[in-house]
Amino acid sequence: MASNSTPKYNSNSLENSLRRSPGDGMNHEQNDEIPCLPGEALITDKDVIYMCPFYGPVKGRIHVTNYKLYFKGEEMEPLISFSVPLGVIARIEKMGGASSRGENSYGLDITCKDMRNLRFALKQEVHSRKQIFEDLTKYAFPLSHGLLLFAFQNEEKFPENGWAVYDAMTEFRRQGLPNGQWRITFINKNYELCDTYPPLLVVPYSASEEDLKKVAAFRSRNRIPVLSWLHPENQSAIMRCSQPLVGMSGKRNKDDERYLDIIRDTNGQTSKLTIYDARPNVNAVANKATGGGYESEDAYPNAELVFLDIHNIHVMRESLKKLKDIVYPNVEESHWLSSLESTHWLEHIKLVLTGAIQVADKVASGKSSVVVHCSDGWDRTAQLTSLAMLMLDSYYRTIVGFEVLVQKEWISFGHKFSSRIGHGDKNHADADRSPIFLQFIDCVWQMSKQFPTAFEFNEHFLITVLDHLYSCRFGTFLYNCENIRDKEKVREKTQSLWSLISSEKSKYTNPFYTKELNRVLYPVASMRHLELWVNYYIRWNPRIRQQQPNPVEQRYMELLALRDDYVRRLEELQITNSPKMNSSTTSPSSPSQIMPQVHTPF
C-alpha cells in the first residue's frame, strides 16, 4: 500500500547517495532488499562490480525493476547504493567481448540523460551479461518492445490531484478573458484546426472562425497566432504561432496579413506590431527552401520583424554533449573556463534570456502586442513566451503558477516532449532529441539566482521537475501533444508530477520568498552574470559539489520552525486561559494583563 507520507525524489550529490542507503523518500514497499514504489516489480538481479569513477571498483548487486536500476554495494563501509529510473537511461552498450582479458573489462556501459554514465563489470565465465542486457534494454525502452511506460503501471496515491492544477478556462479568466477585444474559440475542440494545439484558444474578437481557417492554411502545421498572455493594464498581448508558409516564391496571404493587423489594433497604443522570430536571420531565409520563411516588410508594412539569433535543436543538443564531456566524470581544473566556453552552453542560455527580456520589455514598457514564433512554434517559441510571462506576471513565480505556466505554454501547446526526450525509445541517436526544456529550466534558475526573493519555489523544485522529465514515473511530460494524451487517457491512467509537489509543498518552497504583485523582473543576461548550474550539471561528482544544504537557507528554516513553535505555544496559552477570561468579572484591557509575555525573535 502507498503510504500517506509525501514521496520525495533524491536529487542530492552522488556522494550523498553513495554514502547511505537510498533515502529518496518515495512511497516505498519493501521488496526484501530494495525499496519499491507501488506497482513496481523486480525483474532480475545479478552480482556485478560497479566501476565508480570516484571511489574505484565496488562489488555489489544490481537489481532491475520495471521502474529503476538499483545498485547495492557489499563489503564496504559506509554502504554504497544508488538507483536510476530506467527512463533516465539513453543508451545501453556491451563492454568488452569473449576475448577481453583485462580486469573488469567485460560488462555494460550505460549512458544517462541526466549528465552521468554508469559502468558495470561482470564475470565472463558466469555468462550473466546477456540476460541483464536484454532485461535492461526491454524495460528501459518499453515503447520499442511493445510495453507500457511505467507511469501506466505506477499505483502511487497522493492526497491531492495534480491534474487539477491547470484548467484553461480558469487561467483565461484570471487574465480577464474573454473581453471586448478577445474571445475564446472552440474551433479546435476536436483538434480539427490544429492537431498540436489545445482545444481552447484565445483569438481577436473580430476574427471569425472562417478567418482562422484561412490563416491556418498559411502557417506551418496550422499553428495560427493565438494569445498566450494579456497585460492587465495596457492590454498588450503576447501571441505565439509558427512560421508563415512563404516559400521561395515569396507567397502572400491577405487573410494572414489582415489577421496580424487585427492583433495590432487590439490595444490601439502602437502603430506597429512587433514580430519576434527566434531564429537567426540566415536560418529563417534558408527555411524558405522548404516552404517556410518569415514576414517580409512588403507583406506586413505595419509590423516590425526582429530576429533573436537562437540556434536550432541540433546546435543545442551538441552543446549539451560538450558540456557533459567536461563535467562528467572529472572536471579538469586547469582548463575549466576555456572548456566551459567551448561548449557555448551559457551563450545559448544568454540568447534565450535576452530574447525573452526583449519580449517582456516590449509588452510592459513599449505597450505593444507581440507575435513570437520560430519554425514550428513548439521549441524556442515556448522558451520565449514562458520566460517573458515569468518576468511579467508574479503569479507564474508561485509554485502553482509555475505549474500552470508549464502545463499551458509547454504541455498544452505541443512541445514535443516525447521526441525531444525519447521516453521509452531505444533510438538514442534520434535527431529530434534536444534539451529545449532543460534550457528553459536553466534560464529560470538563472533568474532565481538574480532575484532570490521573487520565486516561491526553490532549487530542489526545479531539479525535481527535471528528474521527472526523464523518469516516466508520472504522465505529466509524456507524449508530444494534448491530442495524443487524450487518446492515451493520460489523465485517467497516470499520476501527475504536481501531485507529488503538492503532497509536501514545504520541501519545494523558497524560505526567502516575498510576495510582490505587479513587479516585472528584468534579469541581467550578460555573460558576467550567468553561472553554470553546478548543483544540477555536476551534482554527481562528490568533489565539485556546492555545500548542501545551503547553510543560510537551513538557518532560516530553523528560525521559521522556532517561530511556528512560539505561535503554537501562544495559541495553547490562549486556549488554556480562555475560561479564566470568560469567568472574570472585570475585563482586562489587553491580553497581556492575564497572559505571560512570549517574546519571539521576529
UniProtKB/Swiss-Prot annotation:
Pfam families linked to this entry: GRAM, Myotub-related
Molecular function (Gene Ontology), one example: phosphoprotein phosphatase activity
Location (main, coarse): cytoplasm
Catalytic residue list: 374 (phosphocysteine intermediate)
Domain Myotubularin phosphatase stretches: 162-537
Domain text: The GRAM domain mediates binding to PI(3,5)P2 and, with lower affinity, to other phosphoinositides.
Protein name, UniProt field: Myotubularin
Organism: Xenopus tropicalis (Western clawed frog)
